[in-house]
């Protein structure tokens, strides 16, 4: 190894060591913030807030080291990817530190420690988040892409935990036994823990980019079209989505009171528009195939789908489109024209929706 190569490796090693030190500090701060919240330890809570200032200073030092490394060594390929990832990681760790300071500040505002039901949820969620954060950091420090992929998948599951804990918090609010300020504080705590899980996913993405050059794939959105019968407009919408945006979305349709059969005339119309059909049946909104919380967007035609489900999932967007129900008689002389109007309007609306979700590169 030449003198230049040795100096480059030494500088990289120093950056790696500093990142590991800050990451360890943040992991301990997570434990301290949650413990302070659950026990009412205000001294420990304020130590987390003060500790965040040291984290911010350490992040600025790492930032300076990275820029100096680029200026001195003019890295390329793997070394450049690593420094680029460290700069992103620096932002993610700093944000996590901010979230922990926020949890600590909310802890000292509580009138008393959280009630048992909420306490259990916080403890469980914090444990999940802590493991995900630890594994994400380990994947980065150890250049372990497989651990990064596994951890990403686990992090996605935390969203389901967040929804259940939110429901329990609402139940506590309905009892009226705690001040409204406490409930808002606990809601913020849950939100911050969820955001730490999100940042952990980003750290896993940094690992994959560093080790393999793999970049984050554009998000594929799950869209559900719903009306009463699921025997006309929603079937057309699903077919348009499949054909026009096969790589950007996954599309389904359902009805809250589905028809027994789909008119062959509708199937013929859809096929004449170049949409390949296998087996098309009217699907029930209540079917186990439609887990409402799995969808990013749910679009209802001719009625509000929220009137037909128990609760609106936290992360799902609900839209109402003014789409005609379709001709009463698909064999009538005007049926083709009515279907054509519905089809054209749906093409426009779905295109605008996917453009909003994915931007100009939608496909």
Q: Model features per residue range: what roles?
A:
Residues 1-225:
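Cytosolic, long alpha-helical scaffolding segments
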Residues 107, 220-363:
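Short polar/charged helix/loop
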